[in-house]
Structures are given as C-alpha cells and as structure tokens.
Amino acid sequence: MIAGEETDIVAVQAEFMALFGPILQVAYGTAVRLTRSRTEADDLVQDAALLAYKAFGTFERGTNFKAWFFRILTNAFYSRHRKEKHEKANLSSEEVPALYLYQKTAEAGLWGSESDPAAAIMDRLDADRVGEALDSLPEDYRVVSTLYFIDDLSYQQIADVLQCPIGTVRSRLHRGRRMLQKALWEVAMERGIN
C-alpha cells in the first residue's frame, strides 16, 4: 500500500468516526426500539455502521449525517425483518378516539393541575414503561414514533430516512400518537399508576 493511500484511509476513518461517534448512543437506542432486543440492536447498529462506512463516499459533506445514517439503519432493519415481519394487530388507530388519553386521565382523576394528560401519565411512568407502550405499536407506527419522539427528527428528516412522502410520515405519526395514548393508558393501568 502506498503511504498516500494509507493517509487517505486514516483521514476517511477519522472523519467517519467524528460524525458517527456522537450519534452512536442515539442510533443504538433507536435500534433497540426497532428490534425490541439489545442483542439484535447490537447487530443492527454494527451492520448499519459497516454499510454506512462502505457508502461514506456517497455522503454529501455539509448535509445531515444523522438523517443519512438513520436511513441506512432503518433500511437495514427492514431488510433484516422483511421475511419475519409480524405486526401486533391488537391496536388499531381507528378504534382509538382522538382524545383517548385526555378522557381516561380526566375520568381517573389523574390530570390534576397539569395541562397535558400525556405528561400526567408520563410523570408517573418510568422510561421502561413508556418504552413498553412504544414497543406495543405496529412496526410502521413504532418506527415513525421512535424517530420523531426519541430521536427528535423532523417530519422531513423522517421522510428522507424512510424514503416516503412527508404526508405518510404525518399520517403514521398521527395514528401512532392515538395508538400510543391507548397503550400508555393500558400500561399505566397494568402498573396501577394513579
């Protein structure tokens, strides 16, 4: 190997790690939410990182690396689970009223002085319980909700990551919110939160 080529490889590796390092924990958290397994999440992040490194030459410098990487991560997830895809059909957005959580928290007297009933429930649940509620969503809604609520991506970034129209993102997020309200309430009641 020529010394100049070796220097170039080291520079590319350093640049990749400078961009990838700060998002590693967030990517791992997303992978755990997508796969519902820490072991599978490890494999998914490793596969996505390898794919991203191999495709790093196609990354446009100055654009959003996090969104670019999350596109690779979600594509890797979908590729891995395409054959074994099994969605939980127990929650249907059509069955959940738009103000479900508002109604239930008011009925149970949990709302109190807080202006947001979701906050009233979330304050009484730890992160694991909120994660349980998020995990109960069907895959399409779970992915969009995770990217929006956990990873703080914008509608446009999520559309770019998932390679779908922004209207699809909005629709899935709207339905996902409704299903999440019901799931949060069910988790809260299972845990005897009051």
Residues of each region from the PLM?
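A short pre-motif secondary-structure segment
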Residues: 144-148
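C-terminal edge and immediately downstream basic/flexible tail or linker adjoining helix-turn-helix-like DNA-binding
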Residues: 2-7, 15-16, 91, 160-161, ...
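A short, charge-rich alpha-helical start-of-domain segment used by transcription regulators
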Residues: 3-29, 39-42
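Sigma70-family region 2
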Residues: 49-64, 83-85
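Amphipathic, Lys/Arg- and hydrophobic-enriched alpha-helical face
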Residues: 19-38, 53-55, 134, 186
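Arg/Lys-rich amphipathic alpha helix in sigma70-family domain 2
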Residues: 60, 74-93, 99-105, 123, ...
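Structural recognition of an alpha-helix C-terminal capping motif at a helix-to-coil junction
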Residues: 43-50, 63-75
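Hydrophobic-face residues of short alpha-helical interaction/recognition segments
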Residues: 27, 31, 56, 69, ...
